[in-house]
């Protein structure tokens, strides 16, 4: 594994840094919680929303809005290492990149399995930001065991009629399109008989109900389908082969360098809090073990980065990082929780005060981070699922 950039990679890294120096307002670097997140009202702050309207076209001009996409589809056509460098440099500046379900999941899956008509219809609107996408996979009783889903899609002439329910759908309340898996052959084994659809979220019969979390944030939703008609032309791939498409989609979700950098930035923030704030200094002086705890988190964040480097190295050799991706996901999720606990220890009683209270620590970020971290071992595949993958595929242990 080579840690140093080649001359070509160093030139690209310098290009990215120069772009950020010129185009990215440094005042936004201190507001990382806004990137990709919506407030309780479901709207971005006005100044940030205005910035993104001018920022996204600048990225698309360079192909950086979708760096992994081929150039013929409006992407950057970057190598795996160049994508890694771009993600790393943007993460250190806390600079936003277009992303989400459309860029990361729907688009790549359409490129692999879509017809030419589907590619021409949907891919340009993902790149331009005209279409925002959501993922309609999980159901009550079909989360980790996704193949147990019960939502039905029945062929009726030139349409499929969909009935059922999805849950934990991020961003459904502002999505234009969704990737939907539904059962089209209830008599087939559960991993078969599932089909994959590209769904217009404005179709009559779709009801989106908010799920407000303990942070008073509206990110997740329940989505109900009542006789929703989906054109057969929006079936992606073959009927009853949707499970294999869904597996491809989920393969695009990986723990990358951006998460490691985010954790290293949190360590920097905590170190600054310990050195400069009255509360942080007092707690560290009373409890020297906090120094050790913070040092452990700093080391673990560095290790997380090395795991990401290993995955990139494997991809450059044409290898599939199967168990390694699970190792990265497990390590990152568990570190998220440990970092949040360390932050709470560091702020002491002040860690319980939220938002803009005068007595809150760092604007109330500590309790929000702590509560949000509890979702990390669940989203994107639970820690238990990752351990099973590591055991069976990595250690060749028998299934329980």
Q: Which stretches of residues belong to each language-model region?
A:
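N-terminal glycine-rich flavin-associated loop
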Residues: 98-117, 143
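C-terminal helix-coil-helix/basic helical segment that borders enzyme active sites and/or dimer interfaces
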Residues: 30-39, 279, 284-291, 302-358
